[in-house]
């Protein structure tokens, strides 16, 4: 009897333990179910469900709502429409000066693009006036050229020295450099007459009998290069070549 009662107590304890174990497992399952339910609720807002739901194409009947989630027809979105080529001109024509719809007057005073290609007709009166001006400009230059050539010729003719009419100074210079120092001084009759006829004013006769139009200075330089014949020696009685000296007769 005692053994049977002991066995019953052991079986009752086992049964109570088993019931507690089953209760604990059921409680764990319930807690796990609650956690999964809360996770699913979170995923509806932040998880995969929300991403999958919003990644699709938007519905056509969506409308913009205010804070009270009431649809307002004024807030309806207008779909984007492509540019209408009929109402909007091309950009090149829009920025061209001949564009039909320009409202500013930036290029108002400028000629159009087609007018720029036209030829400009010249005015015949203006052209003739320009030719006259060119001719008048050429005339002074030609006159200056003529004067320059004349001045150079004059300088070359007269040994690059100005023309002097004072023959007394030139005669003295010529006598000094020509070696005619042995001639008597002025105031002695025939010799002075001979000297004045030789160094007198133009025209003079050269050694060959030709009339020369040269300046006395040029004649002086020529005498230095080609010295003239010495003056004729005076004969007895003071007669020269013009008075019929025997030296002239020989």
From Swiss-Prot:
Region spans: Disordered: 1-150, 175-250
Protein name: Myelin basic protein
Pathological association: Defects in Mbp are a cause of dysmyelinating diseases such as the shiverer (SHI) and myelin deficient (MLD) diseases characterized by decreased myelination in the CNS, tremors, and convulsions of progressively increasing severity leading to early death. The shiverer mice only express isoform 2, the MLD mice have a reduced amount of Mbp.
PANTHER family (UniProt xref): MYELIN BASIC PROTEIN
Chain positions found as Omega-N-methylarginine: 175, 181
Sites of Phosphotyrosine modification: 146, 199
Record's subunit section: Homodimer.
Gene Ontology BP annotations: maintenance of blood-brain barrier; MAPK cascade; membrane organization; myelination; negative regulation of heterotypic cell-cell adhesion; positive regulation of chemokine (C-X-C motif) ligand 2 production; positive regulation of interleukin-6 production; response to toxic substance
Polar residues biased stretches: 197-206
Bilayer-crossing regions: none
Compositionally skewed regions (Basic and acidic residues) per UniProt: 1-28, 95-113
Alphabetical list of InterPro entries matching this protein: Myelin_BP (IPR000548)
Keywords for the protein's UniProt record, in alphabetical order: Acetylation, Autoimmune encephalomyelitis, Cell membrane, Citrullination, Cytoplasm, Membrane, Methylation, Nucleus, Phosphoprotein
Entry-annotated residues carrying Citrulline: 157, 163, 239, 250
Site (Cleavage): 221-222
Family matches, as PROSITE patterns: MYELIN_MBP
Protein family membership: Belongs to the myelin basic protein family.
Function: The classic group of MBP isoforms (isoform 4-isoform 13) are with PLP the most abundant protein components of the myelin membrane in the CNS. They have a role in both its formation and stabilization. The non-classic group of MBP isoforms (isoform 1-isoform 3/Golli-MBPs) may preferentially have a role in the early developing brain long before myelination, maybe as components of transcriptional complexes, and may also be involved in signaling pathways in T-cells and neural cells.
